[in-house]
UniProtKB/Swiss-Prot annotation:
This is Transmembrane protein 208. Expressed in the brain. It comes from the Eukaryota. It holds the Pfam family TMEM208_SND2. Residues 151-174 are annotated as: Disordered.
Length: 174
């Protein structure tokens, strides 16, 4: 466990972000390939090949490939013609960013590929991804929107009460 830092976290320089993004991409690429290759080889050479297993392996490979490509696109650095760094791209290691969720998806899919070697019921673990996406959508978009609508409906009553109170005060002043 890392020791607690005192004070604010220091800001990262653009070159440091580019280097950390490269190492992060390399790590998650190696994780995806390191889990997918043995899982594919073992499942198709040792176990029975079914339509379900073929479909789930293709789906897993699509998830891994698209997640990695999304992270690579997101973190792409831009350089000037002279080779100077103009833009470091998005920081893949930023807490609370979308890259954190994409990395979780790669970890979930890689683990599912390996667990599916034990039992085909482990393919159901992939259902956690859309469940989490729905939960995040609910917490960040739908629920605040509904509570804002309810607050707007309650405000006219409060405004009417305040208006009556102000009217009474005005009458007393006259």
């Amino acid at each position: 466990m890392a020791p607690q830092q005192k004070g604010k976290q220091g800001t990262k320089g653009a070159k440091q972000i580019v280097e950390e993004n490269k190492t992060t991409l390399t790590f998650y690429r190696n994780m995806a390939i390191g889990c997918a290759a043995p899982a594919l080889l073992l499942s198709f050479l040792v176990f029975e090949v079914t339509k379900t297993s073929v479909f789930m392996h293709i789906l897993s490979l699509l998830i891994l490939g698209s997640s990695y490509q999304f992270m690579a696109f997101m973190s792409q650095a831009k350089y000037s013609e002279s080779g100077a760094l103009l833009d470091s791209g998005n920081d893949l290691n930023m807490e609370g960013g979308i890259a954190e969720n994409v990395k979780d998806l790669i970890i979930l899919t890689s683990g599912t590929l390996l667990l599916a070697l034990i039992s085909n019921y482990f393919w159901l673990v992939l259902l956690l991804a859309p469940i989490r996406a729905g939960w995040m959508l609910w917490g960040s978009v739908i629920q605040p929107w509904l509570s804002q609508r309810n607050a707007q409906d309650d405000n006219p009553q409060v405004d009417e009460k305040k208006q009556k109170k102000m009217d009474r005060r005005m009458r007393r002043m006259r």
